[in-house]
Design a protein with these regions (language model features):
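Bacterial N-terminal signal peptides that target proteins for export
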Residues: 2-13
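Short Gly/Thr/Asp-enriched flexible loops that form oxyanion-binding sites at enzyme active sites
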Residues: 114-136, 278-287
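Bacterial N-terminal signal peptides
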Residues: 11-22
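Accessory alpha-helical/coil subdomains and C-terminal extensions
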Residues: 28, 34, 58, 62-69, ...
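ATP/NTP phosphate-donor binding region
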Residues: 25-102, 328
């Protein structure tokens, strides 16, 4: 009788453990990790070498370096692209945004983490901020050191990105970048250093928050339109209008304006001096093209501060729009999407004021 009783007790204990494990697995959030390549998937010649090949390892190899994420979430990985982010392009952006929207429309998907190279991460983050149609968390993550380096920053960043994506308080924040324990909003993000692991900043507004002990602590929210409040829909788009960024500098001429238009640009963003200013020769050339229907947006080479309307440049007279706090590279992203709807400079100006 004692043996039978012991067997029954042991059986009941095992069933209870299995039930607990199963219930625990079922309650863990479901996170998709979409990999695009970049330094975070890079492979160096040695652990101490600064040289490496971006996008050399697969999503499964990359995630195997961070087994701890399996403790906090149910993870599924997909390889969307495998490139250095200097080669990021509109085709991959559209593919990525459509896949994110497809996944987030599924009730059992709780969030998305996207691994990405840091060179153009701010552009991809902003594109997704304007085209994702969900309040569920979308977090981009990268690294400044390849996966094979001593003290690689990728694994910690990936863990923090997943931890941020599973947190209920991360919903409705817009697309975010999580690196070096900072949570950075896609509406105001810039890479500020070529080497430091703390390269990303929100230069105008400051970070949305920080990651601490695997938890997000938020200190602000974006007041700009994003995700579910965005008017842009890429569902049926297969390409985006061509927009070029040209630089103003001492003695700049109309050369790059003419080249952009001849190359098929429908819009031009000027990375101007100071408050979005440019040489008279460049301004005259752009005004001429604006009258022909080319959208012109003034931005600034300077990282901090707005490019304001109506200061030195009479935007209304010239048919220009001003980018306000959006830097030239993110301004290009917004202008491409704006041109899918209109080329009216006043309507484009509204968008640059709201996003």
């Amino acid at each position: 009788m004692k043996t039978k009783s012991l067997k029954q007790s042991l059986s009941a204990f095992i069933m209870a453990v299995l039930f607990t494990v199963t219930a625990s697995a079922q309650t863990k959030p479901n996170i998709y990790i979409l990999a695009t390549g970049g330094t975070i998937a890079g492979q160096g010649a040695s652990q101490v070498s600064s040289g490496y090949k971006a996008g050399a390892i697969s999503v499964d190899q990359m995630l195997s370096a961070v087994p701890q994420i399996m403790d906090i979430a149910t993870i599924k990985g997909e390889q969307v692209a495998q490139i250095g982010s200097q080669d990021m392009n509109n085709e991959v952006w559209l593919k990525l945004a459509k896949r994110v929207n497809e996944l987030l429309s599924q009730p059992d998907v709780d969030g998305i983490v996207i691994t990405h190279g840091t060179d153009t991460q701010e552009e991809t983050a902003y594109f997704l901020n304007l085209t994702v149609k969900s309040d569920k968390p979308v977090v981009l993550v990268g690294s400044m050191r390849p996966a094979t380096a001593i003290s690689a920053d990728g694994p910690r960043n990936i863990y923090n990105a997943v931890a941020c994506a599973i947190a209920p308080e991360s919903k409705g924040k817009g697309v975010m970048v999580v690196m070096d324990d900072k949570i950075i909003g896609a509406d105001d993000i810039a890479k500020t250093h070529t080497l430091w692991v703390s390269t990303f900043e929100d230069p105008n507004y400051g970070p949305l928050g920080i990651m601490y002990n695997g938890k997000p602590i938020y200190s602000r929210e974006s007041v700009k339109r994003h995700t579910t409040k965005s008017e842009f829909d890429i569902t049926n788009l297969t390409e985006l209008p061509r927009v070029e960024v040209i630089l103003s500098y001492s003695n700049a001429t109309e050369l790059f304006v003419d080249a952009a238009v001849k190359g098929g640009a429908k819009g031009i963003v000027v990375a101007g001096v100071g408050n979005g200013n440019m040489t008279t020769a460049m301004q005259n050339a752009l005004a001429k093209e604006a009258k022909k229907g080319i959208a012109v947006v003034r931005s600034s080479r300077i990282m901090v501060g707005p490019t304001c309307q109506w200061d030195e440049v009479d935007d209304d007279a010239l048919g220009f729009s001003a980018s306000w706090f959006i830097n030239p590279y993110r301004a290009r992203v917004l202008l491409m999407l704006a041109l899918t709807k209109t080329n009216d400079y006043k309507e484009i100006q509204r968008m640059f004021s709201e996003y």
